Amino acid sequence: MSEPDPEPRHLSPRQAFDLLQEEPRAVLVDVRSNMEFLFVGHPVGAVHIPWIDEPDWEVNPHFVRQVRELMLGGVICDNDAGCAPVVLICRSGKRSTEAGRVLLQSGMREIYNVIDGFEGERDEDYHRSTLGGWRFEGLPWEQC
């Protein structure tokens, strides 16, 4: 029987923010589309590497390479400090979980997912940012 695919570690938005403040090597990667990143807003300091994007809405075939380049080839690991954390965020935590699985399968280690993402799930009126997420928690964000 095969082992289940590795899962990224899940953090609340506040836990992710705290990790990013405490660990200077940590990087926050926003995996949402260009439109979401630009027009909905994004966490301050996030690096944008889309997991799925327009025009075809297919998985970015260069995603792992782009994250590795961001992390200096994936070699930001040492015996004393371990590996630099990569924190992934999307709208509600689903795409970032998928992206995190792929990074783990590629051999990267310290991969985290922000549960509830930037906007969280929709409420009964189909509104976002009312139940959870980075914005709901009042964490720093900006809009282009």
State each model region's role.
Residues 1-27, 34-85, 96-144:
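Rhodanese-like catalytic fold shared by cysteine-dependent sulfurtransferases
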Residues 89:
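Short, surface-exposed ligand- or partner-binding patches at beta-edge/loop junctions that are enriched
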